[in-house]
Amino acid sequence: IVNNSFGAVKVANVSIEAAQGWSLAAFGDKATLAHEKVNSNKFGFSLALGNGEKKLTDNKNTSKQTLLDSAVEGCFMSGVGDTSANSIGISYDAIVTPVSEAVTNTAIASVLFIIAWDAV
């Protein structure tokens, strides 16, 4: 994420919503989902912003989950003119249950990032 504004911003919220018949599951050891029924269409997701802590899906809600509900370390960006701090990297990973045939060109989830001004 790159902040090209003249003010500081932060990632204030991140949520994920399952789509197209897929369900959210806990992200963890791949072996956990590998033992699920074939074509059960479950996936776990992990996300980290900047050098911040990984946020993981869990088993509490299979359709939509909030991964981040307030800005934490790694979520803050300065404005234009400070190239050392006006962007953050995003790293992510996913695990899925076995499928009987390849799944291609299918959006199984959407991830929503809410960016807000960082009022100092």
Describe each model-derived feature in a short phrase.
Residues 2-10, 66-120:
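C-terminal, structured domain-capping segment
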Residues 1-63:
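Surface-exposed interaction patch
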